[in-house]
Amino acid sequence: MVEAIAAVTRHVRLLGPWTSWVCLGVLAVVVALLWWTRTRHLPPLRQAAVPAAALVVTAVAWLIVEVIWHPVAEGAGTAVWAWTGGVVLVACQILLGGGPAAGADPATGGDSAAGGDSAAARERARARHPRLARMAGSGTGLAAALAAALLAINAFFGAYPSLAAVLGLGVPTTPLDSLPAAAPLPRAPERGAGPLLANWTAPSDLPAEGAVVTATVPAGDQSGTRGFKPRQAVIYLPPAYLTAQRPALPVLVLMAGQPGSPRDWFEIGRLKETMDAYAAAHGGLAPVVVVVDPLGSPYRNPLCSDTPRGGRAATYLQQDVPTWITTHLQVDPDRSHWAIAGLSNGGTCALQVVTRAPESYRTFLAMSPEEHPTLGGEQRTINRGFGGDRAAYEANDPLSLMAAAPPGRYDGVAGLISIGAQDEEYASAVPALVNGARDAGIEVDTRQYEGGHGWAVWSAALADEVDWLGERLGLV
């Protein structure tokens, strides 16, 4: 049943050059119809009160979400709030509007000639527009406006490509435990000298594509904190990993941004397609990609740090995740063949991990990273994220860590920092991070891709940077 639903919903495409314009047209039609049926009969002041109420409600919602709650450091964005305002306008039309005014002829909208005619007119109006029909029409209009807004916002960020992706059915997954073991114990396969590809001959049982599996990668001791509870990890296993004699494959630990989840890299970021294409060109070899959760919730930001408020997120990424990988997966244990990467908040986190613990990962990909870990402003971050402790903040800030690093601290560390060509908000962070990294002895380069702060950039970045990554991790 699930497979049938997935097969059908994969064909329901949500992205295209027409999406935003069609959604705008739908919203305009809904607003116009509701004006015609519910608000044009109102007195002028009451008509003006409808958009005014929508503006006030939207402003209050913005204040609560962006100022008081502030779940996402960079905010939801103008596009999100513009579409939210459109949906609120439709709701206000429904709640504050009415049908033809008492004393008006429903057919003409004009005044009736006599009071007796007025009663008859009201009866005719009730007959023509029964309450249930009006409720159904209003509900349909609100649903259409909401659907249009969600589709338009999705298109703006270049997010879910299909309905299957929204439902989490775009990429089939199986539990890791369901895979057959290639050896009696989860030991690391041996690896010869030189690039892995030079010592590898693809066996006859090599699958045509990799597998996507899920697993729980638990956090360790969280005593003394509010606790960090990561969501389930999603793992890409390349074709070579699925053979009877697994080679010693390198590891890429990958993170999404906020709000986001590990599945986003598969449902939106085309990770499997990218890695399958790389593997097809390299005899089935590709990194084992473990997409982990650095947040615990789409709307919680533990700042990739060990704090009483956020739990031990840093320890999770630097110790718990590597320990779990070497215990449960048959991979190359050499950390010089491991990398960590992420986008936006996850890109910042990748930089934090590398600058705090370069012994854990020697390679990084930071896609559209923030200049500093943030909850929306430096002082707010220090106060809310680190209990007012500036020293704790600086101990988790990549620029501060790199500036204070002794010579040789980052020997052998290298990475790429990438950005969207139209990402004006995050572009200013790149020069500061690059200069700070180079001054600290980190080998770093930058890459730019067409687009803003969205998945069009991040999926393109991964597809482009995987060749550099494969060479860096000793695959080729």
Kindly give the residue locations of the regions a language model identified.
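Non-catalytic cap/lid and distal C-terminal segments of serine-dependent acyl enzymes
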Residues: 1-104, 116-476
